[in-house]
């Protein structure tokens, strides 16, 4: 795809580039833009996204609404397109009423787009979304450690981070500071092991701390590039795990519409913590899946409890005087060394016991009850395990590095259910599998 050849003539920068006969692919062009000074990069990025969003229909069907359409869109080919009450305030209202989206050129463009996505994902067995209505519940932790666990079992796995403004997959998979290779065929993702690859916008940034301040159309264009221009393993992927931002934003809508255009969504794993504040937002996420017809593979309860060995706990006791608190200002002093020494002498078997505590209050039946309410499987709970957090910080596979840790068993059990729900070897009826998982 020669962006500079097809870019809008209104862009003087693109016009100059065309006159110089620079034939760069979208991937090469975007990678170049990130490396240039901000004013020039902005011009290049504007030019690129003018091209990418020239046709804003994300389906192989001409009936599909544009990605930025209002809820309740009647579709660009409807007789009421641009006139229905749902069209009020939609940025596409005038275009729909003029027939722009239903023109032969638009139909051909959207068909070409769908074909491109289909070709790029033709060797992917399952594309799995990891969703959460609430930020900070450990969605990226679950996504990346599921990827590590599946890869450790020999599956070929890819991780696509579509959290454009807050990417974290690169860090959690140990790929910080890496860059992607851009060629005429597209982007080659970063491989953190022979069968685990990751693609993220963080690989395109000149500085790890650089902010990505983009509006919806630019995010949509970036996601389109990820799906069409990333060259995954030639032998194919068993699982493409797509880590999304919290909520139901442009990234979710665009990703789902792009994938559904080619029948490429296998399902979604929804992550929550036990408290009602999180569940209230996750219920919205589950309703999003219902509206968009995305199968929910199951609900994961993260940070279900805090669980660790007694030997790894710290202990504090009230200070004789506040001035003795060692600078913590809480009126206590550390007594861990004395406690552990006493336990070793008096009752050493206690040190191997697991200490547990509920971190979040659970209400209304908790995540398990919420899953039952929506008729979807409950995949299990992951305890708040310090070693799991350390694995993410270090970019390591948790179940291999800390195989005896408290969350290793639950994480392996979660992946067992995931593989059963989305088998690679043989296709099974999704509804029957969901029913089996709910009964377990």
Predicted regions and their residues:
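C-terminal boundary of histidine-terminating zinc-finger modules
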Residues: 395-404
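Residue-level signature of catalytic and energy-coupling elements of molecular machines
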Residues: 124, 135, 161, 169, ...
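A short, charged, Gly/Pro-tolerant segment at domain boundaries
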Residues: 428-440
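Extreme N-terminal, non-catalytic leader segments
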Residues: 57-132, 426
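Phosphate-binding loop that captures ATP/GTP phosphates
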Residues: 156-158, 162-214, 220, 224-227, ...
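Conserved catalytic-core segment of NTP-binding enzymes
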Residues: 110, 239-376, 390
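Walker A/P-loop phosphate-binding motif and the immediately C-terminal alpha-helix
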Residues: 120-121, 126-164, 286, 292
């Amino acid at each position: 795809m020669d962006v500079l050849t097809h870019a809008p003539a209104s862009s003087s920068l693109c016009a100059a580039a065309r006159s110089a006969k620079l034939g760069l692919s979208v991937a090469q062009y975007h990678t170049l833009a990130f490396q240039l000074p901000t004013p020039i990069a902005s011009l290049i990025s504007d030019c690129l996204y003018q091209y990418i969003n020239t046709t804003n229909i994300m389906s192989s069907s001409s009936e599909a609404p544009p990605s930025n359409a209002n809820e309740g869109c009647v579709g660009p080919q409807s007789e009421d397109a641009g006139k229905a009450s749902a069209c009020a305030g939609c940025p596409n209202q005038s275009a729909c009423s003029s027939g722009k989206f239903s023109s032969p050129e638009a139909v051909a463009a959207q068909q070409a787009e769908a074909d491109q996505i289909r070709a790029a994902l033709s060797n992917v067995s399952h594309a799995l979304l990891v969703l959460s209505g609430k930020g900070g519940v450990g969605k990226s932790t679950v996504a990346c450690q599921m990827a590590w666990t599946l890869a450790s079992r020999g599956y070929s796995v890819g991780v696509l981070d579509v959290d454009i403004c807050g990417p974290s997959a690169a860090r959690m998979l140990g790929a910080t500071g890496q860059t992607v290779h851009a060629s005429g065929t597209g982007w080659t993702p970063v491989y953190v092991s022979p069968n685990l690859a990751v693609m993220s916008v963080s690989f395109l940034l000149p500085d790890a701390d650089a902010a990505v301040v983009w509006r919806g159309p630019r995010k949509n264009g970036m996601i389109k590039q990820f799906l069409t221009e990333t060259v995954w393993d030639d032998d194919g992927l068993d699982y493409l795990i797509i880590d999304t931002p919290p909520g139901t934003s442009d990234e979710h809508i665009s990703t789902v519409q792009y994938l559904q255009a080619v029948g490429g969504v296998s399902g979604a794993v929804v992550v929550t913590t036990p408290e009602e504040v999180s569940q209230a937002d996750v219920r919205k996420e589950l309703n999003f899946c219902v509206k968009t017809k995305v199968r929910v593979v199951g609900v994961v309860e993260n940070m279900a409890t805090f669980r660790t060995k007694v030997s790894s706990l710290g202990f504090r006791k009230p200070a004789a005087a506040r001035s003795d608190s060692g600078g913590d200002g809480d009126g206590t002093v550390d007594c861990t060394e004395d406690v552990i020494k006493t336990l070793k002498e008096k009752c050493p078997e206690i040190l191997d016991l697991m200490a547990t505590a509920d971190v979040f209050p659970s209400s209304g039946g908790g995540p398990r009850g919420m899953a039952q309410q929506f008729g979807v499987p409950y995949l299990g709970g992951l305890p708040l395990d310090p070693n799991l957090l350390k694995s993410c910080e270090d970019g390591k596979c948790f179940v291999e590095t800390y195989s005896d840790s408290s969350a290793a068993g639950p994480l392996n059990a979660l992946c067992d259910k995931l593989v059963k729900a989305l088998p690679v070897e043989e296709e099974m009826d999704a509804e029957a599998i969901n029913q089996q998982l709910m009964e377990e």
